[in-house]
Amino acid sequence: MLREVSVTRELNVWLVKQVDKLQAPLCQVFVEPFSKPWVLLADPIEAYDIMTRRPDFDRSNFITDGLSPMDNFHARMKTGPQWRTTRAWLQDLMSPTFLNNVVGPVMFDNSMNLIRFWETKTKLANGSAFDVNDDLDHSALDGMLSFVFDRHFEHTALGPQIETISRIAPTSLAVGPRGEVRFPRAPVHEFISALYETVDKIDVVTKAMSPKLAMWFIRQTPSYKRVTAVKRQVVKEQMQGALQRLEATDEPRTAIEHMLVREKKAAEKQDRKADFGNHIMMDEIAGQFIAGLHTTSTTLAWTFIYLTRLQHIQSKLRDALHQACSDAHAEKRVPTLAELTASRVPYLEAVLEETLRLHATSVARQAKRDTEVLGHRIPKGTNVVMIANGPGFHAPAFDVESARRSATAVKSKGWRETSDMRVFDPDRWLVHKAGAAVAEVEFDANAVPQIAFGMGPRSCWGRRMAYLELRLVVCLVVWNFDLLDVSPELADPKASYGIVHRADQCYLRLRGRRTL
């Protein structure tokens, strides 16, 4: 394993090879030294059952250890009182009111900022491709900054890049060996840099043979201590500003303000003094940026990679968007936020879901007590890793006898399976709308299994927010640009598995559509 994964950086690929080798929906592999073996589960029905209905499973220590650079962030906690406390702080942030009135407008403005930046880059590149991975990271982080912190936090990730690009001449751009244009990178504020460094450390810990040992070494380094101090200092300053605004208006607006109000209400209910300065809340606030960074930017990168490779799907998506926002298309303008969110576009949903399906990372749960999976004994403390890129997800499922399933899993029905489950095909998510007078399709979220966000009570907390950002960015990019073909060596980047399945590069060759 070490030899292969050190070269490919694709642990999930190695795991699914073990499943294919044994041709069994349940097998065990030894991954971490001096630890129990992992149990690999390659069956979406049983995986769904474990995540949603089985109380004998909880957050895996693979995740709690892997996310340890985030310190007290809720995603690395076992289910218990402290996890419930932190989740209660976040209760308002996924409400329709907050998403529609706060997140939506700032995400739209942020996406348009990215569009304008790419228009400048497109002119400078003069028909050549350029890597947008960093741009997508910066844009995702700026989106979070704009509603977690107050607008008075003037620092952004994309801003310095825009300023730097505005001052360069096309003749000064470096050109890579494959004809790609290389734009210079500008330094960012120390808080933003600290967030990126935390993400890098998560990647190191997750991929280490012994995550706990790797994290112990990281904690001893001056750089980690500096990063932690910077994050907590900036968050503390923002919390103090939020408290002052709440005293003046008593009306929460930003994410921090909503969290502080929730802590105040909880303290009143429990007859205690509100603890606004605790490190758990500080780490939770900083963790919001990190959790929403690579997850959305990585999905966007893969989406644009597929749309570049598959021009017919790109055209079909653009046609669907033009039809959904027909007034904006007829008036040759960019649709407004209200127009983009007025109705769901089935084909857009299908494109996003297909990207998530093909690049989901495996989900792990840990047995809280001795239990069984598919008739096999699972001892307490065992990590069960649900393979997201194997049989049942990227290939036809194994035939499992009902007698081997749990009582709740027996009642579950399977999904539509085809021989091309490794192929990017959004149409697999569309079904004919029942009772429609004309041939009309609708998006079926349950058409095919995918577990990119996990499922059940420990699924991704920010799922709704992520979908909102994905829809807005993809809509606006496809509306404003043609994603032209790039050379084969740029169209098929290498990738690595960590917390996310991240492409090393995302090369785009853009042509503006504003005048088309």
List the predicted regions and their residue ranges.
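N-terminal membrane-proximal hinge/A-helix region immediately C-terminal to the signal-anchor transmembrane segment
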Residues: M1-R76, P81, T85, F108-N113, ...
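Conserved cytochrome P450 K-helix E-x-x-R motif and the immediately C-terminal K′/meander segment
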Residues: E4-D20, V334-L374
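Cytochrome P450 heme-binding "Cys pocket" and the immediately downstream C-terminal segment
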Residues: F153, Q311-I313, N446-P449, M455-S459, ...
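Short, small-residue alpha-helix embedded
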Residues: T295-T308, V473
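Cytochrome P450 I-helix active-site segment
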Residues: R309-T361, P379-T382, S419
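C-terminal helix/juxtamembrane-tail motif
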Residues: H501-L516
